[in-house]
From Swiss-Prot:
InterPro entries in UniProt: DUF5119
Compositional bias segments (type: Gly residues): 310-320
Name this polypeptide is given: Putative fimbrium anchoring subunit Fim4B
Recorded family membership: Belongs to the bacteroidetes fimbrillin superfamily. FimB/Mfa2 family.
Lipid addition sites, S-diacylglycerol cysteine: 21
Chain segments carrying region Disordered: 274-333
Biased composition (Basic and acidic residues): 294-304
Entry superkingdom: Bacteria
Entry keywords, A to Z: Cell outer membrane, Lipoprotein, Membrane, Palmitate, Signal
Signal sequence annotation: 1-20
Pfam families referenced in this protein's UniProt entry, alphabetically: DUF5119
Length: 333
């Protein structure tokens, strides 16, 4: 009986030793290297986001992606040696969502549809994007090393800001103005580094004054080498009589609930602004403020029923948190 017990203990010890060796072999087969990421926000934005997400995608699908949320200043990660494509973007945005994150080629930022506004037609529009800062690296090699690799990175804003003022007559008959822009990028391919237009108008709020309407809106940046955003539907682009056009749409909801619509082609001005370039300090050159020609005013027809004596309630057009970026008055031709 004693011999049986002794034999069992010897067998158990041998199994534990083999398990330990096997586990050590596995760890040796899958080593990791330390990566220390430092993020520089100087000249990017004064209003830092909450933090960033960093994703290492193995090249050619060899291995698993390494994914971690870091502070806005960066942090350390453990990454197996190999060749990777990398994306970095800020998280906890208000309107921006992420999809297609399973691969470097498909990860994309977008905004959802404008549901819940209670205004007919807005459910087909999408929200304007808030601030998004990204970095994409097509190939980065991580060597096997016990030394921590330091990576100094700087993200770039991929959301462009615009403003415009349009003179109009008959605004006393208007309760609300709904604005949208069609033809700008409403989503952004982070890995590919380009904006994409899916033919969904981008909604924005409009402020109604005595004789003009003003608004601020945002859109994802377009690819730098192109003057127009890439369309998702080739067939729609080929059959459209206004392919590539960027159209500003204003819907004047009058006091009798009827709607009068005005459309303005701003293609040439948008293209010029997208290619404004940078100054000697490396910052974007401020675009010129262009006054609206008097002959291009919009006139809202008088409704069949008298306006509300208390006055119509317009949608607020104030936007907080705008920095010294691209704010421009667009002309109407």
């Amino acid at each position: 009986m004693r011999n049986t017990r002794y034999g069992f203990l010897v067998l158990l010890s041998s199994l534990l030793m083999l398990t330990g060796c096997s586990r050590r072999d596995i760890l040796d087969d899958y080593p990791v290297s330390g990566v220390d990421i430092k993020l520089d926000w100087d000249g990017v934005t004064d209003q830092l986001p909450e933090g960033v997400r960093v994703i290492f995608y193995p090249k050619n699908g060899d291995g698993r992606k390494v994914d971690k949320y870091l502070s806005v200043r960066g942090g350390e990660m453990k990454v197996p040696p190999g060749r990777y494509s990398v994306v970095v973007y800020n998280y906890n945005t208000e309107s921006i969502r992420i999809r297609g994150e399973e691969s470097y080629e498909t990860i994309e930022a977008y905004t959802g549809n404008c549901n819940g506004l209670g205004i007919e037609g807005t459910e087909k529009m999408v929200w304007s994007p808030d601030s998004l800062y990204v970095l994409n690296i097509d190939e980065l090699k991580i060597e096997k090393s016990e030394e921590v690799l330091r990576l100094d990175w700087k993200l770039e804003s991929v959301v462009k800001k615009y403003s415009f003022a349009v003179e109009a007559k008959g605004l006393e008959y208007v309760a609300t103005v709904v604005g949208s822009i069609d033809g700008l990028s409403d989503c952004y391919c982070i890995g590919k580094g380009r904006g994409v237009c899916s033919s969904q108008p981008i909604y924005f709020e409009v402020k109604k004054g005595d004789n003009k309407v003003t608004a601020f809106f945002t859109a994802f940046k377009q690819v730098k080498e192109m003057t127009m955003p890439t369309r998702m539907s080739t067939s729609e682009r080929e059959t459209s009589s206004e392919k590539g056009a960027i159209i500003l749409i204003l819907k004047f909801i009058k006091t009798d609930n009827t709607v009068q619509e005005a459309t303005i082609d701003v293609t040439e001005i948008i293209g010029t602004l997208e290619n404004a370039g940078t100054g000697e300090d490396g910052k974007p050159t401020p675009p010129p403020e262009i006054e609206l020609p008097p002959d291009d005013k919009i006139e809202v027809d008088k409704p069949e029923t008298p306006p509300n004596p208390d006055g119509g309630g317009g949608m607020g057009g104030n936007v907080d948190g705008w920095g010294p970026e691209d704010n421009v008055e667009l002309p109407v031709n």
